[in-house]
Regions:
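Alpha-helical scaffolding within the catalytic cores
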Residues: 33-35, 157-167, 208-214
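The substrate-binding groove and active-site-proximal loops of carbohydrate-active enzymes
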Residues: 147-155, 197-204
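Short, glycine/acidic-rich beta->alpha junctions
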Residues: 96-104, 112, 157-160, 203-210
Length: 279
């Protein structure tokens, strides 16, 4: 089923899709869901939300998400906790800016401090590997953490990929809202660059990003769901035409010439094709 067909279904029915590379991963996810829904024991997650958001220097994309989504969702009006958390009787923890590091995200997934959060909201850049890069299938859409300075070469210690999910992670019952380019998957052809009906090829084939797959099928019990972007994420997901957070209103058109999530080209020599950061 092409991603484009699913985009159309999403408008009316908000459909999801489940896909893994092996039968074992399907089995683990199915068992996790059945166990979560049928057990008489207390649910494995705590009544807690975590917001994880970066804000790199000289980077409009992450700073916009911080100002218009992460901070209002964390602090509400006047510095008070947002009412949505109070109404839901949730405790809220934040990893914002300098605290949004690779190691802190690993600890969130381990449930080290207060147990596994029921909801994780992350807003960051997503790693983009170019066509032909052998790392693309495993690392596309990896979470770019605050460990990266916002400019210069990016290294493995700066991002959080599928291979960084701890073996002792406690993900069972978690839902992850994952705002990052390629967080959910990658199309074969660029969804936005189709000049003269000649789309630019960006991958050998369409594929789902590995990080959500690993979280959903973790041997210790998988996450219940991951909500993420296929292809690039844009500030039009949360910003209206007047430059303010859009709330539930959807702007009538996309204007690629302004207000898009910036992309940052990485510098530094490497014997392999260079990955880039996408907003």
């Amino acid at each position: 089923m092409p991603f484009e067909f699913q985009y159309s279904l999403d408008i009316y029915w908000a459909v999801g899709r489940l896909w893994f590379d092996t039968p074992e991963e399907f089995r683990r996810y199915a068992q996790s869901v059945v166990r979560y829904e049928s057990t008489t024991a207390p649910v494995p997650t705590s009544r807690r939300g975590v917001i994880f958001a970066t804000a790199h220097d000289f980077d409009d994309a992450t700073q916009l998400f911080m100002r218009q989504v992460a901070q209002p969702l964390s602090f509400g009006e006047g510095g008070a906790p947002a009412a949505v958390w109070t109404r839901a009787k949730f405790v809220l923890d934040t990893c914002l800016g300098d605290k949004a590091t690779q190691s802190s995200l690993a600890e969130v997934l381990r449930g080290s401090e207060r147990g596994t959060p029921a909801l994780l909201v992350s807003g960051t850049h997503g790693l983009e590997c170019p066509l032909g890069d052998p790392r693309q299938a495993d690392m596309q859409g990896a979470i770019v953490c605050q460990d990266w300075s916002g400019f210069g070469a990016i290294k493995p210690e700066h991002w959080f990929a599928a291979s960084d999910v701890p073996a002792d992670a406690k993900l069972h019952g978690m839902i992850h809202f994952f705002f990052a380019c390629y967080g959910g998957g990658c199309t074969e052809f660029d969804d936005y660059d189709r000049l003269n009906k000649q789309p630019r090829r960006i991958a050998d084939r369409p594929f789902f990003s590995r990080l959500p797959q690993v979280k959903l099928s973790h041997p210790n019990g998988g996450a219940l769901a991951v909500l993420a972007h296929i292809e690039r994420a844009w500030v039009y997901s949360f910003q209206g035409q007047r430059g303010r957070a859009a709330g539930s209103r959807i702007p009538p058109r996309l204007d690629r010439g302004s207000n898009h999530c910036d992309r940052v080209s990485l510098v530094g020599r490497s014997p392999r094709p260079r990955c880039r950061v996408r907003g």
